[in-house]
């Protein structure tokens, strides 16, 4: 038998080349103790802060406390099946969520998993849920209006695309209703073809009842608004870490639109419950408590979340993310810890009052305490033209109404102001699920500030408004079209509108 050394060498070399070490190394730790949704783990020495870890039974958690001898992990889900001594392994991934247009029309949990029974989600990419907000250079000042469809807000407390406007008030004052109407009002724009005008909506429900969230989704579906919306739900029965994470997940989904030259609106309903969930986690992790037992970094929690809402400059695609955070107060106390924090972070607040709500003024916006720090730069010119006057007249009305209670002998001009104020207040009332287009709001407010409501009894104002809108839509659509296209009330439009109002006022009387 002839053995060739060269041949054997070649075979050996080939064997050595193909020899691969099929061993997978994963870093693991051991559960020291578990309870109240918190696990203490020994051995994960190289774990990162905010990293996702996986327990033996497949449950996931996030490493939050990195201490000398152990790691504090918050558990996303139930801790019942996790036992002392079980292994925990690193995933080497910071908590992320799926993003993209494939999520539109879906209801997901705080980790981006579908919970609506409509099958798996088709997503574009995955993004980290907690990222750094854009700096000063990438931003641009807010200048495009974000119409809510509510006269009281669009005229007096305008919101721009890229703004953060807080909705604050006691329970049952219509905070969610304002947010819902803002979503419904985007339907006509989103049915168009102009991608730059569309506004995609993300609604984050934190700590709410499942029935409430189901009702909200049902309304969106019935009104045809679910197709451009994403609902992120961490309900009251979900673990505190899920309630803490949901707003970050929703923001990551909104940022996808912002960073790709589109516009998005995110509603956090509500951040008081997120703060409570964060307080619970922090106390269980034995972090030192501060004011009202909240941890010292609860301000940073909300500021890093809300700073991600921004209007980007043209070189980055001019996209925007508008945030409407909701805060629930106790007995109208806006000076509590969380309300003052969020007021100082946002660019203004819409203050809803239970007293006004019970008087039948809905939306129950307290115009005196509410403010938009972006102001009229977030309004079209037509709205600026009519809103300036209504603001002034309502301010005078509020001032005089306080004095009018003391004396009955008021002069004619004061009486006239009081009458006008009462009618304008009535005019700003609006039913739920009936947002108005901006040109219709302009026409209605024009009628109010030009004295067309003064001869009417207050009880007839709403009827007059409905009749006027019907008349304008059917007989004078060109007036509304002129306001919509030119975005201002020109001299010609003023004449036409005055003529139409005179004719309608005569027929109404």
From Swiss-Prot:
F-type ATPases have 2 components, CF(1) - the catalytic core - and CF(0) - the membrane proton channel. CF(1) has five subunits: alpha(3), beta(3), gamma(1), delta(1), epsilon(1). CF(0) has three main subunits: a(1), b(2) and c(9-12). The alpha and beta chains form an alternating ring which encloses part of the gamma chain. CF(1) is attached to CF(0) by a central stalk formed by the gamma and epsilon chains, while a peripheral stalk is formed by the delta and b chains. InterPro entries: ATP_synth_asu-like_sf, ATP_synth_asu_C, ATP_synth_asu_C_sf, ATP_synth_F1_a_nt-bd_dom, ATP_synth_F1_asu, ATPase_a/bsu_AS, ATPase_F1/V1/A1_a/bsu_N, ATPase_F1/V1/A1_a/bsu_N_sf. GO terms for cellular component: plasma membrane; proton-transporting ATP synthase complex. It is found in: Cell inner membrane. CDD domains: ATP-synt_F1_alpha_C, ATP-synt_F1_alpha_N, F1-ATPase_alpha_CD. The keyword Cell inner membrane applies. It catalyses: ATP + H2O + 4 H(+)(in) = ADP + phosphate + 5 H(+)(out). The record marks 370 as: Required for activity. Disulfide bonds: none annotated. ATP binds at residues 169-176. This is ATP synthase subunit alpha. It comes from the Bacteria. Its main location: membrane. GO terms for molecular function: ADP binding; ATP binding; proton-transporting ATP synthase activity, rotational mechanism. PANTHER family: ATP SYNTHASE SUBUNIT ALPHA, MITOCHONDRIAL. It holds the Pfam family ATP-synt_ab_C.
């Amino acid at each position: 038998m002839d053995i060739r050394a060269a041949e054997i060498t070649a075979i050996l070399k080939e064997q050595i080349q193909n020899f691969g070490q099929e061993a997978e190394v994963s870093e693991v730790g051991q559960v020291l103790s578990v309870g109240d949704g918190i696990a203490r783990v020994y051995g994960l020495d190289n774990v990162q802060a905010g990293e996702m870890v996986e327990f033996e039974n497949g449950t996931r958690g996030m490493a939050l406390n990195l201490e000398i001898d152990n790691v504090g992990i918050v558990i996303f889900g139930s801790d019942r099946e996790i036992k002392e001594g079980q292994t925990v392994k690193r995933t080497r991934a910071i908590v992320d969520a799926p993003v993209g247009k494939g999520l539109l029309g879906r209801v997901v949990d705080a980790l981006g998993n579908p919970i609506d029974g409509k099958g798996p989600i088709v997503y574009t990419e995955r993004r980290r849920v907690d990222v750094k907000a854009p700096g000063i250079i990438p931003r641009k000042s807010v200048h495009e209006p974000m119409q809510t469809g509510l006269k009281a807000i669009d005229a007096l407390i305008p919101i721009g695309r890229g703004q953060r406007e807080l909705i604050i008030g006691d329970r049952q004052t219509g905070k969610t209703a304002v947010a819902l109407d803002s979503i419904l009002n985007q339907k006509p724009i989103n049915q168009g073809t102009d991608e730059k005008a569309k506004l995609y909506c993300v609604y984050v429900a934190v700590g709410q009842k499942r029935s409430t969230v189901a009702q909200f989704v049902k309304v969106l579906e019935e009104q045809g608004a679910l197709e451009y919306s994403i609902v992120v739900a961490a309900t009251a029965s979900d673990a505190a870490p899920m309630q803490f994470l949901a707003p970050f997940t929703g923001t990551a989904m909104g940022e996808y639109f912002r960073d790709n030259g589109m516009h998005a609106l995110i509603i956090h309903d509500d951040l008081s419950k997120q703060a409570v969930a964060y307080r619970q986690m922090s106390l269980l992790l034995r972090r030192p408590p501060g004011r009202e037992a909240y941890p010292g970094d609860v301000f940073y929690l909300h500021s890093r979340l809300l700073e991600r809402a921004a209007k980007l400059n043209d070189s980055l695609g001019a996209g925007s993310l508008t945030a409407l955070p909701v805060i629930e107060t106790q007995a109208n106390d806006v000076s509590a810890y969380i309300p003052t924090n969020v007021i100082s972070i946002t660019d203004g607040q819409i203050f809803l009052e239970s007293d006004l709500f019970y008087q039948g003024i809905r939306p129950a916006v307290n115009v005196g305490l509410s403010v938009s720090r972006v102001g009229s730069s977030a309004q079209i010119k037509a709205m600026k033209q009519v809103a300036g006057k209504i603001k002034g007249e309502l301010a005078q009305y509020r001032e005089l109404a306080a004095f009018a209670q003391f004396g009955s002998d008021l002069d004619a001009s004061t009486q006239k102001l009081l009458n006008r104020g009462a009618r304008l207040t009535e005019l700003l009332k609006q039913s739920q699920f009936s947002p108005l287009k901006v040109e219709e709001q302009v026409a209605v407010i024009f009628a109010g500030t030009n004295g067309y409501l003064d001869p009417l009894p207050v009880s007839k104002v709403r009827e007059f408004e409905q009749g006027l809108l019907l008349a304008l839509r059917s007989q004078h659509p060109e007036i509304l079209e002129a306001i919509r296209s030119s975005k201002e009330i020109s001299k010609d439009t003023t004449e036409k509108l005055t003529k139409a109002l005179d004719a309608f006022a005569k027929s109404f009387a």
